[in-house]
């Protein structure tokens, strides 16, 4: 599958650089360029990209508002947003995930890291750079959001293994890495993630990460991962 990428950044030079990178990659193509959030929303509807590479600070409509409108549009449910920005602070990371972004990466990332990030997002997984993960932890420790009552009730439906998997996913681990931590197959890890998403009514893996932090399923002390539990 060729991954269709839409670029949204107010700097034409950066868009040109990204276009050359994606168009020179066998499994990707650039389907459009937007210089502000409004253009990004319109092009997302017109081109139906798999991934929108979104800057935060843009004129007319910023990247967070554009991301929120894309994620709330039923006709754009298949479109994933990867935030690429210089602002990897705690508030921006939290707001981006609340808006519906599937990933968050700093502009200092190497080209191969960006390409891998786009592939990860297109495959339906969430992605946070290590610094973004630390910022998210800091944000929820300093000013934790209350766990919504309906979500708190759904947490009771999670098995111990599903709680383990959600916690590891919130730390940024892929299905393969979760499988290695818990000594299960990647398919089993993916199944547990999908079941947890269904039980918690999470629209995607990124929202699952937000729920994990809001409801205390992950903390800095969990960096080494939970101990293996029985299937």
Features from the language model and the residues they span:
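Receiver (REC) domain active-site loop signature in two-component systems and cognate sites
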Residues: 58
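Short, flexible helix-to-coil linker/hinge segments that flank and couple to helix-turn-helix
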Residues: 93-98, 103, 108-160, 214-220
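Acidic catalytic/metal-coordinating carboxylates
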Residues: 36-39, 61-68, 88
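Active-site residues of response regulator receiver
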Residues: 9, 55, 85
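Recognition helix of helix-turn-helix DNA-binding domains
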Residues: 172-207
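Short amphipathic alpha-helix used as the core "switch/output" element in two-component signaling
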Residues: 42, 64-77
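Basic, Lys/Arg-enriched C-terminal extension of HTH/homeodomain DNA-binding domains
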Residues: 40, 197-231
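Active-site beta3 strand of CheY-like receiver
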Residues: 47-53
């Amino acid at each position: 599958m060729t991954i269709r990428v839409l670029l949204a950044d107010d700097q034409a030079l950066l868009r040109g650089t990204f276009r050359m990178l994606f168009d020179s990659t066998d499994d990707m193509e650039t389907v459009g360029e937007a210089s502000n959030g409004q253009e990004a929303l319109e092009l997302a509807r017109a081109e139906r990209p798999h991934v929108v590479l979104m800057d935060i600070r843009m004129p007319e409509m910023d990247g967070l508002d554009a991301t929120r409108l894309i994620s709330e549009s039923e006709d754009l449910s298949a479109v994933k947003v990867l935030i690429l920005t210089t602002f990897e602070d705690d508030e921006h990371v939290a707001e981006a995930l609340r808006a519906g972004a599937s990933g968050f990466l700093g502009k200092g990332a190497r080209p191969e890291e960006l390409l891998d990030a786009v592939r990860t997002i297109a495959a339906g997984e969430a992605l946070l750079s290590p610094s973004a993960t630390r910022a998210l932890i800091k944000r929820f420790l300093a000013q934790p959001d209350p766990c919504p009552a309906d979500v708190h009730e759904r947490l009771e439906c999670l098995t111990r293994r599903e709680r383990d998997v959600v916690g590891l996913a919130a730390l940024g681990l892929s299905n393969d890495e979760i499988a290695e931590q818990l000594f299960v197959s990647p398919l089993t890890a993916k199944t547990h993630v999908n079941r947890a998403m269904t039980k918690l009514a999470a629209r995607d893996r990124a929202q699952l990460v937000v729920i994990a932090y809001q409801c205390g399923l992950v903390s800095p002390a969990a960096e080494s991962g939970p101990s293996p539990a029985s299937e």
